[in-house]
Swiss-Prot record:
Binding sites annotated in the UniProt record for substrate: D123, G124, S125, S126, N211
Name recorded for this polypeptide: Fructose-1,6-bisphosphatase class 1
Gene that produces this protein: fbp
Lineage summary: Bacteria, Pseudomonadati, Pseudomonadota, Alphaproteobacteria, Hyphomicrobiales
Assembly mode: Homotetramer.
Principal subcellular localization: cytoplasm
Listed InterPro entries: FBPase_C_dom, FBPase_class-1, FBPase_N, FBPtase, Fructose_bisphosphatase_AS
GO CC field: cytosol
Binding site residues for Mg(2+) 1: E101, D120, L122
EC number annotated for this UniProt entry: 3.1.3.11
Catalytic activity of the protein: beta-D-fructose 1,6-bisphosphate + H2O = beta-D-fructose 6-phosphate + phosphate
Pathway(s) it belongs to: Carbohydrate biosynthesis; Calvin cycle
Pfam families: FBPase (PF00316), FBPase_C (PF18913)
Organism listed in the record: Bradyrhizobium sp. (strain ORS 278)
Amino acid sequence: MAREWPMTHPSNHPMDHHHQTLQAHLASQGADADCAAVIEALADAARELARQIAIAPLSGIDEGAATVNTDGDIQKALDIVADNLMREALRRAPVAGILSEEGDRPETVNEAAPLCVAIDPLDGSSNLQNNISVGTIFSIRPRGRDVLSSFFEPGTAQRAAGFFVYGPQTCLVLAIDRRVDLYVLHPTLHEFILAKSGIRIPQDTPEFAINASNRRHWSGAVRNYVDECLSGAAGPRGRDFNMRWIASLVAEAYRILMRGGVFLYPADSRPGYREGRLRLVYEAHPMALIMEWAGGSASSGRARILELSARSPHQRAPLIMGDVRLVRDVDMLHEGVEPLFETSDAPLFARRGLFR
């Protein structure tokens, strides 16, 4: 039976309303039963993963020997723990196949099941020793003619998407049925409780997030955008911008949802980065769905992320996401730019700007 829990204010005075559990809210909103079962399975795994992350400095699991996964990324002991927890939970749900960052190819679970899940079990694990928020990112999509091809459909095929954040609070941001909701894990009830429904990205926030240390590798279009922001009120944009960079995709996305602004992880000229660095299927696609259903946008700089299809399970893509107008500004600077990467003094980029 779906449950509702009375909440208690930190002052120990009861609040004047009830907050629904994840299970109760999904049921009350008429969510598809199969999608709901997958989301609840992921929430079960996230509860245990949050516990293990919280005690990692005491258990030593965050100091385990690092290996390299099939995609060439450093894999910590907690990455493997997270992957195992998520897979075990999903095997009990109506899931045909699982594509994880930690595996080479999709795992077939039950070919007769209706859904497939793409997942980054522990995004940003390198941040753990610095006590920075990390997360789990997931995409739920219908099973196609076979498990592998299901993950090669465009992002518009997704039925739901979301991410867990393991930080000051453990929370779930969930995009389902064209809305985005926030749930927080109650520390004593051990339930994900609805905290905010129908999230909309605040508009016109003058903030951008990018790793500025890579400036020398950026395309001229990205350099021009950042330079115009940094020029402040005296520059072509006529206002002062703040710059953010947490180096945690889930934390950056959460901030965008709460505060607005734009996040950029563009392609750059380094080997292995020319098609972007984030994975399309289990990072860019789910983030794009969340952004769009919260009234924002997500682009590669040249195309809508949700219209892109992967050619391989771990294909990478650039990601620019956030406020519709700010994302559009970045896109406009990319229009007609071929090739994308030029020397910093190329005449095209010396002249081209959004306002000139």
